[in-house]
């Protein structure tokens, strides 16, 4: 099976403090890969390095078969969708209008908007203003924005944080179905093992910046 993400000795230090220490991992194509670890383990920093949002102190990132560098970073990220912070959107606009803005920024045809709304189960609420949405609906809208343009890779940093139990369950179901419904490989972080068991096919456990286990979950 081909790999969508590979890292080699990926390291991030701030002064004398090592946040991520020689991280070497492999995310197989077509998987939902769970990045599991307690708060402060280095999950978010690792994801930001994968996206080039944080510059690594050492090591390499390989995305979609290419070692990422300044020359190819933008081209690789055009094939990658992400939700790293809380989803952003204009609260006074509808979900569809928000997606039209993102589609224009990405250079994506507006015909793709209907597809992503169906994937995240927001088609019936597409013409409501985002200010009327629950947190779970806003999270799903954020994923819809990330899915515009049919990325090969989707990176999600703790997307169930702050959701009520019903919202958490809906989000888990949505993420577990992503490879089948969108063709995307998914990298998702969480600090909850029980949550991972409901979503992922592969898991990497991170503790104090080090990968201590990687392999199939079941």
Predicted feature descriptions by range:
Residues 218:
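Short acidic-hydrophobic catalytic motif
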Residues 2-7, 12-207, 211-213:
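ABC transporter nucleotide-binding domains
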């Amino acid at each position: 099976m081909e790999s969508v993400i590979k890292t080699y000795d990926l390291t991030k230090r701030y002064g004398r403090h090592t946040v991520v220490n020689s991280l070497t991992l492999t995310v197989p194509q077509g998987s939902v890969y769970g990045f599991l670890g307690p708060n402060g383990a280095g999950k978010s920093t690792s994801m930001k390095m994968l996206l080039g949002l944080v510059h690594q102190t050492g090591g390499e990132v390989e995305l979609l078969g290419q070692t990422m560098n300044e020359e190819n970073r933008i081209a690789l990220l055009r094939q990658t969708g992400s939700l790293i912070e809380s989803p952003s959107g204009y609260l006074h606009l509808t979900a569809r209008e928000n997606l039209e803005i993102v589609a224009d920024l990405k250079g994506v045809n507006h015909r793709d908007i209907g597809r992503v709304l169906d994937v995240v189960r927001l088609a019936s609420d597409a013409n409501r203003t985002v200010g009327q949405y629950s947190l779970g609906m806003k999270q799903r809208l954020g994923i819809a924005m990330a899915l515009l343009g049919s990325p090969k890779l989707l990176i999600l940093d703790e997307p169930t944080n702050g959701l009520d139990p019903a919202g958490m369950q809906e989000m888990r179901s949505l993420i577990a179905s992503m490879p089948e419904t969108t063709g995307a490989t998914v990298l998702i972080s969480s600090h909850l093992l029980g949550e991972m068991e409901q979503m992922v096919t592969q898991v990497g456990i991170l503790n104090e910046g080090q990968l201590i286990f990687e392999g199939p979950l079941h």
